[in-house]
Amino acid sequence: MSGLFHHRTKPREIRAFVMATRLTKKQLAQAIQNTLPNPPRRKRRAKRRAAQVPKPTQAGVSMAPIAQGTMVKLRPPMLRSSMDVTILSHCELSTELAVTVTIVVTSELVMPFTVGTWLRGVAQNWSKYAWVAIRYTYLPSCPTTTSGAIHMGFQYDMADTLPVSVNQLSNLKGYVTGPVWEGQSGLCFVNNTKCPDTSRAITIALDTNEVSEKRYPFKTATDYATAVGVNANIGNILVPARLVTAMEGGSSKTAVNTGRLYASYTIRLIEPIAAALNL
């Protein structure tokens, strides 16, 4: 029966045939269906596939990453001269940091001999120096499950004693703190790239307006210790500031490595001299 009609059959022809032939309801419906244009085969297949593919489900839980890490790519040092002054810009690793249950306070003299290890070999060929800028940035290398916090601040009076608590350290100029697993957004300061957002960076910069001298003599850590052993106030004419760092709040009595502290700086090197004569 389905072959009696096709889609070009006119409705009045169907009515004439129905009048002459007694059809069942099913046969009549099939005959009418055969007169309708068939939908494209491609669309029919698409509908069947859509009906067979189950709808994806979405979970409503978002987990924070457990592992933390940053890709450090230090650029080569940049050296240039202006008049009688040599200007050097670079970034280098300052120190490795770890955390324990108890608070551990350390300090670093902000002078070429103690900032990293590379600068001292260069700066000893000049008699004096002056910081144009220097910034310390903490980058974590521990999981987000690591307990503890880092605290940093500057002391500009070298005759002052070191703080022994977070409360005392928090009063230092430029004080900054954060959990030991935080600070990735400070990577731009280390890699010397554009900083889109540093709101979560753990970083601190020396205020060069606070230093007591316009320029300082190049001295070793031993030279400094000898001088302040005679008079603590002498330190103010040898070193512009001291960086104080405290690590506390860990979950273990054994030190757990948390990250690294980098120093990025621009320094003016003044009056060249043979290193052997620079005493």
Swiss-Prot record:
A GO term from the CC aspect: T=3 icosahedral viral capsid
Q: Which GO terms describe its molecular function?
A: calcium ion binding; lipid binding; RNA binding; structural constituent of virion
The entry's family comment says: Belongs to the icosahedral plant coat protein family.
Question: Which residues make up the pro-peptide?
Answer: 1-19
Region S domain, virion shell, as annotated, extends over: 84-269
What Pfam family is a match for this entry? Viral_coat
User: Compositionally biased, Basic residues: which spans?
Assistant: 40-50
Coiled-coil features, chain-numbered ranges: none
Q: State the oligomer form and interacting partners.
A: The virus particle has a shell of 180 protein subunits arranged with T=3 icosahedral symmetry around a core of RNA. Each icosahedral unit contains three protein subunits.
Keyword Hydrolase listed? The answer is: no
Supply the name of the protein.
Capsid protein
Is Acetylation among the key words of this record?
A: yes
Q: Which domain of life is it from?
A: Viruses
Which residues get modified to N-acetylalanine? A20
P domain, projecting, as annotated region: 270-279
Residues of the region (Disordered) are 31-59
